[in-house]
Amino acid sequence: MSEFRQATDAFASNPVESKQEIRNYTMNFGPQHPAAHGVLRLILEMDGETVVRADPHIGLLHRGTEKLAESKPFNQSVPYMDRLDYVSMMCNEHAYVRAIESLMGIEAPERAQYIRTMFDEITRIKNHLMWVGSNALDLGAMAVMLYAFREREELMDVYEAVSGARMHAAYYRPGGVYRDLPDRMPQYKESRWHKGGALKKRNAGREGTMLDFLEEFTNTFPARVDEYETLLTDNRIWKQRTVDVGIISPDLARAWGMTGPMLRGSGIEWDLRKKQPYAKYDAVDFDIPVGTNGDCYDRYLVRVAEMRESNRIIKQCVKWLKANPGPVMVTNFKVAPPSREGMKDDMEALIHHFKLFSEGYCVPAGETYSAVEAPKGEFGCYLMSDGANKPFRVHLRAPGFAHLSSMDAVVRGYLLADVVAMIGTYDLVFGEVDR
């Protein structure tokens, strides 16, 4: 008899060994799991179906964004910001360009400030539409995703019309924005699905300017939000999956540095747009929705209410922009490129253009921290300059990183199925978490 067979028989005949049972087991949740929202990897220690401990692993989407920004001139790193939270692109840009403007002591024209405010809120609605659709899909409500993407597609067209890109816009610039709002919206082309009267009906709202299109959007959007709420807010299954699940107390939210809907869902009224106004948020009227219980359901209600408030802000910005034409970029050619027409007639303008896009501009030595109220929370940019044309240090404060850090403290004691609901309400995007 072989030694292996002897050892096997001895193990099988041992009465003590045969009675041993595994109480807790470890399970990998993600990064391939459909509810992982990107590349989330959670190591869950389970006691049956109950979560005993959660260990989030990060870094699978790390691209060294901060170091990349430190190797480029200041004005060439704006596109990197779009690729952090790639659902809330322009809000990321806003924090970065505000930091540069703070160090240089420049201020964007008033019209550019209103445009930034308007597009920050367009971005917020886009983010929350993606969130409500994907979170509902995670919990089994498939129809909401189709409804939400109907409106999100219209806002993607607005992005494309103003910047040429549906996602990575690179529209904000130090000193203003890339260009003024276009006079017309993209039109649907004839296809085998859309032709004749149907095509004309789809293009009916796109005959005017972008501001006309957005004005019509703000008039119809509240009724669309009502449709989402009809599907979810009083839905018995939705409430069973979210009410009293993932409760985050105000003290816990503060201790983990939570911001945005995660913090306001726990009843803390903190919003940088009100507490530390930037752009033109001090000139528009809106309210800050807050929750009471701090559970997944409250965080859902806060985000739905935020979409309504963002719609109010966009409507006010559209009204002001229609009545007040003006420049959207500073006229300092050391910071802003000259017009193409000017470069054809003026050699000095051509030199400015060449210098600006070859070596950029030198930012005075100093350091600053600039933060914006992004859809997921406080997105901040700490920028340090040594007087050169490249940043000495760039540090990005991503709200999702702080929120993910609290995962272990929040999920303990809940069932595995509840973890999916909690991850959904965290609204994680790993471009910003891993950076």
From Swiss-Prot:
Reaction catalysed? a quinone + NADH + 5 H(+)(in) = a quinol + NAD(+) + 4 H(+)(out)
- EC number(s) on record? 7.1.1.-
GO CC field = plasma membrane
Query: What keyword terms does UniProt attach to this protein?
Result: Cell inner membrane, Cell membrane, Membrane, NAD, Quinone, Translocase, Transport, Ubiquinone
Q: How does it sit in the membrane?
A: Peripheral membrane protein
- The record's top EC class is translocase
Grouped into one coarse class, the protein's main location is membrane
Q: Which Gene Ontology MF annotations are present? A: NAD binding; NADH:ubiquinone reductase (non-electrogenic) activity; quinone binding
Q: Which Pfam families match?
A: Complex1_49kDa (PF00346)
InterPro entries xrefs: NADH_Q_OxRdtase_suD, NADH_UbQ_OxRdtase_49kDa_CS, NDH1_su_D/H, NiFe-Hase_large
**Where would you find this protein in the cell?**
Cell inner membrane
Q: Which domain of life is it from?
A: Bacteria
Record's PROSITE patterns? COMPLEX1_49K (PS00535)
Can you tell me which family this protein belongs to? Belongs to the complex I 49 kDa subunit family.
Query: What role does it play?
Result: NDH-1 shuttles electrons from NADH, via FMN and iron-sulfur (Fe-S) centers, to quinones in the respiratory chain. The immediate electron acceptor for the enzyme in this species is believed to be ubiquinone. Couples the redox reaction to proton translocation (for every two electrons transferred, four hydrogen ions are translocated across the cytoplasmic membrane), and thus conserves the redox energy in a proton gradient.
User: What assembly does the database describe for this protein?
Assistant: NDH-1 is composed of 14 different subunits. Subunits NuoB, C, D, E, F, and G constitute the peripheral sector of the complex.
UniProt cross-references to HAMAP family, sorted A to Z? NDH1_NuoD
Protein's name in the database: NADH-quinone oxidoreductase subunit D
Species of origin reads: Xanthomonas euvesicatoria pv. vesicatoria (strain 85-10)
